[in-house]
Amino acid sequence: MEKAGYFAVHSQGLGHATRAVALARGLRERRDDLYFLFLAGVPALDLIAANGFDVLTAPPAPDWPSEDGVIGPVWRWYVDYARYLRVAGRYLRKEGDWGSYRFLLSDGEVASVREAIRRKVPTAMILNSVRQDFAKDFPSRILEDYGNFWFSRLARRVDLILVADPAPDWPNVRRIGPIVRPFSAPREKLRDDFVFQKKTILVTAGGTAIGEFLLRSAVRAFRALHLEDASMVVVSGPKLKAEPAPGVYTYGFLPNLQDYVLAADLVITTAGKGTVNEALAAGTPVITIPPKDHVEAERNAASLGYRYEDIGRLQELIQEKLSIGRLPPTPAGNEEAVRHLLDFLDSKVGTR
């Protein structure tokens, strides 16, 4: 008998969507009786649909306020996010078929979790962290502290929480390793398929508009280097547009970005977990330049020895990283995460 459930995805950027796709594939490989109807707004919706899953259009989450790669006062985002929760909550109460869909998996999407708990639907969450720490000014700290308090009360009622970063020692929390989408072919075949004949630098800005500063700086640094044995592939994402130039090839959106990460010789990214984890799993050298004051991205970048100010060193870093060759791949945590989710489904959904 088929077990159908919702898989809600936080739609700010594409990192949550790529992780959700990887987990859904892993679950379906182990259990062909599972069916997921994804709930997502743009741009996550497009990536999920391009990977072959059914998806119901949901309200989109707000983007961070930013200018030239610097996050603005985050109280503005918290106000917008509170409005999003109200809009998404009304949508889920009206459109959700909670009688037919017997469980909820959520990658970072909170409105669906609140509604599922209200309806006593078994719920599992996948998170980077259980609390936010972006606030720099007093108004932002007030809103962030309240948001963290509110979410901690909600999170304790969730059946299972899988967390990538350090988390409280709650009985429903499990730490997991990096989740990545599997590569579709060996590296050399992918390079042939993509016609990568030179050393290839892949630049990706993620799914938000905040990465424009990195696209601009990376292309400028590459052109200044005049590397005859290298080319650059720029993936601007759904919210930005990059202009092609000699030796620079541009794409707006790639549903199989992980394959380009494996095929490339160097990845330059804004330090989102998804692309960083895929580069580490592929053994591809990576330069991570985080948006300034984006605490999560700064933490990801710092773990690899980078910070926002390294934007001024891109020429030097590109030459250095192209010279080191491939790196040992980092093991992924997909199998462990899938096992936790299957245990949740068997124990909480099997008898419903």
Language-model segments: residues:
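Conserved nucleotide-sugar donor-binding subdomain of glycosyltransferases
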Residues: 71-106, 110-111
